[in-house]
Structure formats: C-alpha cells, structure tokens
C-alpha cells in the first residue's frame, strides 16, 4: 500500500504521499508519484491502493471536474455515484484523497464521500500513523501544513513497512 496525507492550515492545503509500490511483500518501485495536480492546478489528488486502479479513477475524477467546471464537491459526489453503480469501477481497489482551496474529501470504492472534521486526511497502510502524527502536530505546533504533512509521512514511513521516505508534496496557497 502506501501513505497519503492531506493537511489544511491557515491559507494552505497540502496533499503528500510516499513513493513505494509493493507487490505482496516485495518493493517493486520506490519513486512512484501518487499525488497529482488536476483541473488547471486548482485541485490536488492522491491515491492509495492499486496503481492501475488509481490511474483509472484519476482519469474519471478529472473528467468529472471538467464537466462540473472545477466544483470539487460535485465532482467527488458524481465520481462516487459512478464508482458505486458501474460494474467495472466497483472492482477497482483504491482510495482517493482530494482537496482544493475550499474543501477536502476522501472518496471510497463503496461510493462514500467523506469530509474530514479536523482538516486532516490520511489514507493507506500508513494512514493511521500519519493521522496520529499530523493530529498531534496540528494541535501542539505552529508548523505549516506542508511541514506537518512531511513530518507525518516521515513518522509513518518509520513505522509502516509499506511506506518509504521518498515523498511527493503538492500544495495550494490561497
């Protein structure tokens, strides 16, 4: 799996992820880019789960963003509807974390669209570790969203064998 973390603080939102691709217990690649900018660089998205599945979902999500003129909430809900009802999409195993300057969501294969309550998302095998670290840093430091995301990923990578220290970080300042 992997670890993807999204942190929102002040006028900044960040999605960051590690670069490890595993097949069973074997590391296949260490520098994968699991975080991307979409819709004219106005939306951030990261994935955890099957790589091929995630690319399919990125394409579908970007298409929904285009159709709904960058409206993140509407695009997320419409992708989740498709994911839940389309026979091919239902077989895809991945989670998406998406964010823009106004909102952040987790989109699941069950058709759920979840908005976090503390401006924090963490998904993937190292997600619980990253979430705990980021939550503590949000509550007890003045670090930026980017610094918190980096530190949370580093902590997750120290604990989770399916997460490495090769990070991709994308941010939007607004």
UniProtKB/Swiss-Prot annotation:
UniProt xrefs under InterPro entries: ATP-dep_Prtase_HsIV_su, Ntn_hydrolases_N, Proteasome_sua/b, Proteasome_suB-type
Compartment(s) of residence: Cytoplasm
UniProt-listed SUPFAM superfamilies: N-terminal nucleophile aminohydrolases (Ntn hydrolases)
GO cellular component: HslUV protease complex; proteasome core complex
Alphabetized UniProt keyword annotations: Allosteric enzyme, Cytoplasm, Hydrolase, Metal-binding, Protease, Sodium, Threonine protease
Database matches in Gene3D superfamilies: Glutamine Phosphoribosylpyrophosphate, subunit 1, domain 1
Function, in words: Protease subunit of a proteasome-like degradation complex believed to be a general protein degrading machinery.
Subunit structure and binding partners: A double ring-shaped homohexamer of HslV is capped on each side by a ring-shaped HslU homohexamer. The assembly of the HslU/HslV complex is dependent on binding of ATP.
Protein name: ATP-dependent protease subunit HslV
Taxonomic source organism: Pseudoalteromonas atlantica (strain T6c / ATCC BAA-1087)
């Amino acid at each position: 799996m992997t670890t993807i973390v999204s942190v929102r603080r002040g006028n900044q939102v960040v999605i960051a992820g590690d670069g490890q691709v595993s097949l069973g217990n074997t590391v296949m690649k260490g520098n994968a880019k699991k975080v991307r900018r979409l819709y004219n660089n106005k939306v951030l998205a990261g994935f955890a789960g099957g790589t091929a599945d995630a690319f399919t979902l990125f394409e579908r999500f970007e298409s929904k963003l285009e159709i709904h003129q960058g409206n993140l909430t509407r695009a997320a809900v419409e992708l989740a509807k498709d994911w839940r009802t389309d026979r091919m999409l239902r077989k895809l195993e991945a989670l998406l974390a998406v964010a823009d300057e106004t909102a952040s969501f987790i989109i699941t294969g069950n058709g759920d669209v979840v908005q976090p309550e503390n401006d924090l998302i963490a998904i993937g095998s190292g997600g619980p570790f990253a979430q705990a670290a980021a939550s503590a840093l949000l509550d007890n430091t003045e670090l930026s969203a980017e610094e918190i995301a980096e530190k949370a990923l580093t902590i997750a990578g120290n604990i989770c064998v399916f997460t490495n220290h090769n990070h991709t970080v994308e941010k939007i300042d607004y």
